[in-house]
């Protein structure tokens, strides 16, 4: 991983190991940020994404990649953290059961803490409100509200060194995201998007995340390097 110099600006980037967050790392790097990536081992059934996140961080030259352990399966309430709840394999009405309660709020809070320690003022997250599953913590209103909270709740914020929550994919279609990442050199074969990925990172091809990914590559006119089981 690359070395940091005192002249470089720092950013903390939430990196799940999926398509969207990998694209965000590449975007931040292209803007000249020294990238500090953060992933979470939160009890998710698709733990293969953690290996993918490490690969992406290494490939895109993150200064440091940090994995935080959380026990969100102790709370449950989601098909991603409770093995007794099946992952839906067809679209459904409303917010799907793959929504993890307060996940992005928790993740951004920990990223905020790390950013304050690092002296970073920008936090990147790969949320999208166009081609997405309808999660409430992916909407622009959430991002804007969290930024306001961040600047009220931190020493840096109240001392005038405010934080910006960057969500560069917010209004892009999935195909636009794929094209943007490809133009920036993202190797999407390193990523894992599937909610039911096996230990080797192979995808089911049936869940909502697989569907959105497949549609994105198809609309972009590009081959999807996803491996399936």
Curated annotation (Swiss-Prot):
Pfam families: QueC. Keywords: ATP-binding, Ligase, Metal-binding, Nucleotide-binding, Queuosine biosynthesis, Zinc. One of its GO terms (biological process) is queuosine biosynthetic process. It catalyses: 7-carboxy-7-deazaguanine + NH4(+) + ATP = 7-cyano-7-deazaguanine + ADP + phosphate + H2O + H(+). Pathway: Purine metabolism; 7-cyano-7-deazaguanine biosynthesis. One of its GO terms (molecular function) is zinc ion binding. ATP binds at residues 15-25. Its cofactor is Zn(2+). Its EC number is 6.3.4.20. This is 7-cyano-7-deazaguanine synthase.
């Amino acid at each position: 991983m690359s070395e940091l110099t005192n002249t470089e600006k720092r950013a903390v980037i939430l990196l799940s190991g999926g398509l969207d967050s990998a694209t965000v790392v590449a975007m931040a790097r292209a803007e000249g940020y020294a990238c500090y990536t953060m992933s979470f081992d939160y009890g998710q059934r698709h733990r293969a994404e953690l290996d993918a996140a490490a690969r992406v961080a290494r490939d895109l030259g993150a200064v440091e990649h940090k994995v935080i352990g959380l026990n969100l399966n102790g709370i449950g309430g989601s098909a991603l953290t409770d093995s007794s709840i099946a992952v839906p394999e067809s679209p459904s009405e409303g917010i799907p059961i793959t929504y993890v309660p307060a996940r992005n709020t928790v993740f951004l809070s920990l990223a905020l803490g790390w950013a304050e320690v690092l002296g970073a003022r920008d936090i990147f997250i790969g949320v999208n409100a166009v081609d997405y599953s309808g999660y409430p913590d992916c909407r622009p209103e959430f991002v804007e509200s969290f930024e306001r909270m961040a600047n009220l709740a931190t020493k840096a914020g109240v001392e005038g060194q405010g934080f910006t929550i960057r969500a560069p994919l917010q209004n892009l279609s999935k195909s636009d995201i794929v094209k943007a990442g490809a133009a920036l050199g993202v190797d999407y074969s390193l990523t894992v998007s599937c909610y039911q990925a096996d230990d080797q990172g192979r995808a089911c091809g049936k869940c909502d995340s697989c569907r959105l990914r497949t549609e994105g590559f198809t609309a972009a006119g590009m081959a999807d390097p996803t491996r399936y089981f």
